[in-house]
Amino acid sequence: MREALFSQDGWGCQHVNQDTNWEVPSSPEPANKDAPGPPMWKPSINNGTDLWESNLRNGGQPAAQQVPKPSWGHTPSSNLGGTWGEDDDGADSSSVWTGGAVSNAGSGAAVGVNQAGVNVGPGGVVSSGGPQWGQGVVGVGLGSTGGNGSSNITGSSGVATGSSGNSSNAGNGWGDPREIRPLGVGGSMDIRNVEHRGGNGSGATSSDPRDIRMIDPRDPIRGDPRGISGRLNGTSEMWGHHPQMSHNQLQGINKMVGQSVATASTSVGTSGSGIGPGGPGPSTVSGNIPTQWGPAQPVSVGVSGPKDMSKQISGWEEPSPPPQRRSIPNYDDGTSLWGQQTRVPAASGHWKDMTDSIGRSSHLMRGQSQTGGIGIAGVGNSNVPVGANPSNPISSVVGPQARIPSVGGVQHKPDGGAMWVHSGNVGGRNNVAAVTTWGDDTHSVNVGAPSSGSVSSNNWVDDKSNSTLAQNSWSDPAPVGVSWGNKQSKPPSNSASSGWSTAAGVVDGVDLGSEWNTHGGIIGKSQQQQKLAGLNVGMVNVINAEIIKQSKQYRILVENGFKKEDVERALVIANMNIEEAADMLRANSSLSMDGWRRHDESLGSYADHNSSTSSGGFAGRYPVNSGQPSMSFPHNNLMNNMGGTAVTGGNNNTNMTALQVQKYLNQGQHGVAVGPQAVGNSSAVSVGFGQNTSNAAVAGAASVNIAANTNNQPSGQQIRMLGQQIQLAIHSGFISSQILTQPLTQTTLNLLNQLLSNIKHLQAAQQSLTRGGNVNPMAVNVAISKYKQQIQNLQNQINAQQAVYVKQQNMQPTSQQQQPQQQQLPSVHLSNSGNDYLRGHDAINNLQSNFSELNINKPSGYQGASNQQSRLNQWKLPVLDKEINSDSTEFSRAPGATKQNLTANTSNINSLGLQNDSTWSTGRSIGDGWPDPSSDNENKDWSVAQPTSAATAYTDLVQEFEPGKPWKGSQIKSIEDDPSITPGSVARSPLSINSTPKDADIFANTGKNSPTDLPPLSLSSSTWSFNPNQNYPSHSWSDNSQQCTATSELWTSPLNKSSSRGPPPGLTANSNKSANSNASTPTTITGGANGWLQPRSGGVQTTNTNWTGGNTTWGSSWLLLKNLTAQIDGPTLRTLCMQHGPLVSFHPYLNQGIALCKYTTREEANKAQMALNNCVLANTTIFAESPSENEVQSIMQHLPQTPSSTSSSGTSGGNVGGVGTSANNANSGSAACLSGNNSGNGNGSASGAGSGNNGNSSCNNSAAGGGSSSNNTITTVANSNLVGSSGSVSNSSGVTANSSTVSVVSCTASGNSINGAGTANSSGSKSSANNLASGQSSASNLTNSTNSTWRQTSQNQALQSQSRPSGREADFDYISLVYSIVDD
């Protein structure tokens, strides 16, 4: 009673005035879950005497505890102990904590409360005899770790038990925080029973109220006994009553969460009874407490050394300590919500600051705490804690806002170790059982797995607590080790332990650690840790808030108008570096500090931010850091890939200044070393500028903010760092050195930053693979591939951005006013391509830098007027007129031709990420090296009309190219016709590429006309050119855009006409022979395989773009049919194609929606293309294009390599065989097995009847062959082996899988097709060409059935093999040879 009297206010003291009626009764908590509750409550009983009555019952323990209990405990009416009302009735134990309360060990004493349905076993475990709350009471037996005096509550063992018990209860616990027992309390006691104030509530635990109180889960609740009870009653939930509890708005949630949490925590708690309060106890508690308040948990923390805790309170709760020390368990400093523990961490004083971060975060998490997800609470999804107690569903439930202290007994630290765990732990640690979660973080890692077992028992404490482990857990700062409590967390290094507390340490450990508090994540681990730790701890011990607030940096920043809280966070994060802090603040201001302060909650927030830096996103506050961050980018835009943070949400990233990211990055790959998870983290880290950006994409607002804020502009330091990293990247070949000479837009800088970040992470991931160790190779490889894709995407985006920017500058060299506009355009494009993140970083636009490819778009001002006038430059610089409109996002292209269409294509491509080739370049056209030309092609592809416009633009080949204007190119269609033509001047149609200009001209129009080109999507992989247009395909350049065509054509044309003329300097790789030269591009096609598919409409967009009707000589005889459906009958399609001329080969890739037909002549192919384009077949409109050889090769390489056989006549057999083999080899999988060469299959196994195609074509055997091995389908093909004679296609079952596809036709004679497994279906010996399998014309001896479908048997249904007209064997052989070359 005395203590109650001492309490200064209703809140503060749980023992509210006796005279007060204890509003609690007046508003008994809705019985919530306990029917008995009401009786127990006996709200009527509240006459103010409850308090003393409770005390009496408690055996002289300050009834106050109970009183408060009643205050709100009472409310619950269904108290475990039959809280107040019951108390009156008598069973003290039942009432309130009594039993539990009794004795600090409480272990046995554990609450006698059984009545409330919670029976506390001696173990302190709540037996819960039907705890009203459903056990809300988790019997939070904190089993304190220490059991120290503080632990009053159940002894440590009690904790464990309690934990278990609690956990059981936990389910309900939430519902009723009051149920939560003081963690320490062995028994689960209704929180109501327990005194809020008293923390003691357990009654068990120590007569020393304060101890109890510390421990008391209600502790937090303690605040405002009356309020609590009143609140409880009024609120109807424990939670409610502790509004302070971190906005228990979450209460409901918390309750829900609590239960879940309880469960999860239980396990934790159980695992380490000793674990310090934070340990299992808290876990337990957390289950309950979290249930309840978090504070309760805090109690739990308290348990760990509640006293210590109070002692540790240290800065946080100065007032509090005294009360605690006062042994007024009930004393509430108003932070009770936060829970004493919080108190410890920062219950009162700064709880908002640091603790909050902790507390709030935890609160946020609180609900979530259990789950680790909670930790992420803000993140919510993250569950990073993953490892953490997954069982704690609540965490997710709760939400970022769930500020309630959180489940973990520690309130903020909801055992959740899980919550927190996620942080660094997530990575491997997390599994730690979450336990580690908290503290461990860094250790966690250690503990991580290892610890997990032990859970480090201290979840919170974790690790650091290590040292203090038990003690500290959260609440105790004292244990310094404690994550929370102490920032000291001595082990800063462990810091992790600090998980929370440590910001830096965490980082170290894994960002995670930082995640929470580690504001400093970025900052040096140790330092930060220290600083942060202090701060973090909520105690703000080291760099505690007081120190920060007294610092000059703080004053200066505050005087500059930044919010104090933000300044404090920023300084913590920046390690008191005022410059960095100012950068962060400015950046945040744009976000309204949203990201930062998004959780206003307190340092935690910034700590998280840090983390986010390291792990993935401020926004996450709770670091998203899990491995996923790396994934984050995927979801939003390419940039997201960059920032693992994307997960966290755009805000945080943005908040995180690029600088921070950069800094983080500079620190090295924090996570990478860890391994895949590290990689994940690193990806988060990788965010860098990009992170902001990516998030921006994620959160448009964020990007907007960035754009809005000059803050977002990188600081000088950031830029310097970025410059250094760019130089390194240039040395590494990731970036062209030209980027150094180009002006960079802000967007480009962001992209570069992301690129660098990804490169760094890629390297780290690769190193981790090299290093080996306990790294999951698969995960690392996935991460590596992800990084590579991101890098490629970023390069493409950078190229596109620079191209647009440069283009715009060119258009208005003098006025860079348009730059913003330009950027907008890019944004637009980007949006198309999913590069939204690019948009909005305009602030950086001013920055200049170029990527080598980007150099194509040399800023007019930048290079000098002379360059602009040089045709070459103009080539490099896209024509602004057209480009700006159509191509705002287009990647830089070599030719100056505008790539209007290209733009659209480009964006698609980018979004698809298809174009892979050039690091920077878009890789528009497969064949061409020059990007610009692709636009022409694209134009063609996109619309027939466009080509015209493109043509018009370039009509005059001779016409000079003017930088700001689209180069008109010459009117002359074929280069041959234009004497003045130069590579850069030609605007001819892509067809001009063809060695024979005439054809090219002819096709150029058709190509343009052909809608199929429209989808230039095909990303032909060429980096330079999108090159969907196959029209020009012939030119290696020509692929590029039509506009470019002139150029490409110029180049190609000449090339075609005279090999001597090569592509422009940078594009030499694409030889003049687009088919072959482009071959290299096909690699570019990387995206291509996809790309070409993608561009399904665009078709392969081979360089040739057969639009031109196969203008390219090489490609002209090929016909690419796109937009097919798997329902189309292969044989029917083949027959349809054969109507326009004999097919040298037919490769249906119906599953990919395309088919390749090779005619003996280009004329036939062109004819077929014109006839079949837009032809309606089965429920689809076929788009026919004339791909270049390169495109064909790319397709065949990337698609199931089951080119239908290039059938070679059986006779040529021997000959062909040889060729076939080689060709096949090239195709390897391609089922070609020319007759007899099964071996050709790439496997060679089916050598089959070599030349003897007809021979009997033992080829069949190939089945064995490895045909199957290399291509499944191929095998089939092999079987099909054409051997004409036997036609036994037997097809050894060979790839039956493909076989269906393949249905090889045997030679005309047998005509067997091998569909289906090895059966030769023979479709009758009839060699009807129709048969899919036999489909080969009768003549053709060989039908190679190529199953083109290595991917899909169905696809191939139509036998690929197409028999060649018999008369043409020689041609066929030649063609086969070519085909094989192409395949190669």
From Swiss-Prot:
Coiled-coil blocks: none
Occurrences of domain UBA (ranges): 547-588
Keyword RNA-binding annotated: yes
Any single Gene Ontology cellular-component annotation: nucleoplasm
CDD domains: RRM_GW182_like, UBA_GAWKY
Annotated segments matching region Sufficient for miRNA-mediated silencing: 1-605, 605-830, 940-1215
Record-linked InterPro entries: Argonaute_hook_dom, Gawky_UBA, GW182_domain, GW182_M_dom, GW182_RRM, Nucleotide-bd_a/b_plait_sf, RBD_domain_sf, UBA
Start and end residues of each stretch annotated as Disordered: 1-99, 148-227, 263-335, 447-501, 607-626, 809-841, 889-942, 962-1022, 1052-1102, 1188-1221, 1318-1368
GO molecular-function term, one example from the UniProt record: RNA binding
Superkingdom field: Eukaryota
GO biological process, one term: 3'-UTR-mediated mRNA destabilization
Subcellular location(s) of the protein: Cytoplasm, P-body
Minimal N-terminal region required for miRNA-mediated silencing as annotated region, ranges: 205-490
Family of the protein in this entry: Belongs to the GW182 family.
This protein's domain notes: The UBA domain is not required for correct subcellular location, gene silencing or interaction with pAbp. The RRM domain lacks RNA-binding properties and does not bind RNA in vitro. It is not required for P-body localization or for interaction with AGO1 or miRNAs but is required for silencing. May play a role in protein-protein interactions.
Subunit architecture: Component of the miRNA-directed RNA-induced silencing complex (miRISC), composed of at least AGO1 and gw, which bind mature miRNAs and targets the selective destruction of homologous RNAs. Interacts (via N-terminal region) with AGO1 (via Piwi domain); the interaction is essential for localization of AGO1 in P-bodies and for miRNA-mediated silencing. Interacts with pAbp/PABPC1; this interaction interferes with the binding of pAbp to eIF4G and is required for miRNA-mediated silencing.
Protein name: Protein Gawky
